[in-house]
From Swiss-Prot:
Residues recorded as bearing Leucine amide in the entry: L61
Propeptide regions on this chain: 23-26
One Pfam family per UniProt: Cecropin
PROSITE patterns hit by this protein: CECROPIN
Listed name of the protein: Hyphancin-3E
Location in or out of the cell: Secreted
Intrachain S-S bonds: none
InterPro entries for the chain: Cecropin
Signal peptide residues on this chain, from the entry's feature table: 1-22
Family statement drawn from the similarity comment of this UniProt entry: Belongs to the cecropin family.
The UniProt record lists the keyword Chloroplast: no
Organism: Hyphantria cunea (Fall webworm moth)
Signal recorded as keyword: yes
Length: 63
């Protein structure tokens, strides 16, 4: 009897979760913000690349 109740409960939870469609997205998109920060860091390194190379060459000449 208890097993059938547990099975029924699990089945109803599964049906309830499977029938949900189009849940609204959360307003605070944490992973999107992290992704944007990573893109900004990458873009900054790309823009600063030539300056870093010049500094590396100058440091090598100074040795």
């Amino acid at each position: 009897m208890n097993f059938s109740r547990i099975l029924f409960f699990v089945f109803t939870c599964f049906v309830a979760l499977a029938s949900v469609s189009g849940a609204p997205e959360p307003r605070w998109k944490f992973f999107k913000k992290i992704e944007r920060v990573g893109q900004n860091v990458r873009d900054g390194l790309i823009k600063a690349g030539p300056a870093i190379q010049v500094l590396g060459a100058a440091k090598a000449l100074g040795k």
